[in-house]
Amino acid sequence: VDEVGSRNLGVLLDTYHMNIEEQNIGDAIRLVGDRLMNFHTGENNRTAPGRGHLDWDEIFRALSDIHYTGRIISEPFVMQGGEVGRDIHVYRDLVENPSEKTIDAEAKYLLEFEKGMLKKYFVD
């Protein structure tokens, strides 16, 4: 990114993949620093943040440390079927009794979880 030198080129980080590849997600975020343009959140098990084992306090602390102001895009994959479920090979439902009501509850949980993290690390 630095060698290209374009303000239109940056880095996208994804916590699901970082969980597999990085020794320390917070350190990786800090290393990327102001080159971070987009940030995808998803748990180690592809569910909503807070439903797995990732250290979300460290992740949001690192985003705060680099003064991140870009997009945060959540990518929980919670049930089989559909184009996305087929494309990423979701082989089992990740929520009990998937239904519109359950999915709505998961979406509400995710929104409240991430809003809480943003308030904790970004709002004075």
Role assignments for model-derived ranges:
Residues 1-124:
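Histidine-acidic metal/acid-base catalytic patches
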